[in-house]
Amino acid sequence: MDLPQALMQRGDRHGVRLLIAPTFALPDAALDAILSWRLGQYLLTRFYDADVVADQDLVREDAATVHSADVHGIAIDADGGLLTYLTLKQPEELEGFRYGSADRPPFPCEEVHGRSWQESIVDTDDVPAEQCWELARFITDQRRPDEPLIHRGALEIALVAARLASRPAFASRVRLVTGDLDPDIALRNLRYFFIPVATFAPHQVTLPKGHPLRPRYADHPTSPFIANARDLDWATFVRWADIDLALNSGEEETYLRFLLLRQFVSVKESSLKRPNAPRDQSQYPVEALTSPSSLGASDALWRSATSGAIPWQALTLGPGEPLPRDRVSWIVEGFAQALTYRPEGLAHLAGIGPEVCFVPHESIAASIASLDAATPLRVLTTTREDFESFWRQRQALFETSSEKLYGMTEIVRAAKA
């Protein structure tokens, strides 16, 4: 794990070690091992066509598809076993091109989905292409899906990679992140991390016969996506701090905290996405449904609530006053803090402000000790049913709908095991 040219190395935390390094920093044997592991995991998920892999005598993925500056993130257990892997990659020879250049080299996701979906995004054409990266191969060890350490590894490497890309030393090199995803898994998990992405209706893609990834796209509807690093704001960074606090706790407390954090959601959408126009009549104002930021939506909802046009209540609270615990709370202005129980007393659970809602889940709500205003606060409250009705309408226009609204289902399963 001692690589002088690594971008980040972290020692053991509750059984997980982390490494993020470019290809040129990895020994050849390490890269070969990673490519073999990637091939094996994609066979286990049935993303690869096993017959094609056998016919081509593949024992690892093709090293020719890995470029010198590609970045590899790995979470490793105490025995050196790989728990989770991800990569950020680019095609070669992007220098001098803009993201919107028609003749620039394509990213791998564009080779699958084409580029017509980019007609529905804005403010990307003039971004230097070398400031865009594709997030790919984010996968956990499929041989031990029920081990809590596997889920911890995924959370640890995702958090560290996101934070690293946001640091001043790297932020100028990472403006856009693209790729493709399964909306019912990856999209909800990005939502859990408060990372808004522009995405599109999932569809199936037929790759040429003999392509090893043909089953991945023929059998699993996927969507291309793109994220804007400038959409990350204080709400995102506070969320990451709350996730980090959970990961820094003991195993049982970690997964309880992740359960409880599902009750705090971001309603922000990507600034890159041009939303569809509402087709159906709605009691909610158009601005509330189509403003990417919830700040614009908040103002429209506040006006509608104060006029009685929607079944929401507008409240003004002072520091120390409790928010209602049996209703959704949409923060319009100010900051609130949620505390939870620990053996030695109460402890911080989550900080919430504009762009964040508290959505009580009846089965676990009692584990939140308090939810109080920390500053003067304007908040909208409503029932969970009415909030979810609004949220689904809003997601439909941005094409970010998923079957389930709340992320990290895998963590919930691990916590209940």
PLM region spans:
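Cyclic nucleotide-binding regulatory module and flanking cytosolic helices
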Residues: 27-31, 267-319, 393-401, 406-410, ...
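Acidic/histidine-enriched, beta-strand-rich ligand/metal-binding domains
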Residues: 366-415
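A short helix-loop-beta-strand connector motif used in the catalytic cores of GNAT acetyltransferases and
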Residues: 62-74, 94-97, 312, 326
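Short acidic (Asp/Glu) patches
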Residues: 54-70, 102-122, 364-366
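Charge-rich, low-complexity intrinsically disordered segments
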Residues: 198-280
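Acyl-donor binding region in acyl/amide transferases
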Residues: 99-221, 356-359
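Cyclic nucleotide-binding regulatory domains
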Residues: 96-110, 314-375, 384
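Short amphipathic alpha-helix that is part of the acyltransferase structural core
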Residues: 5-60, 72-82, 87-90, 277-309
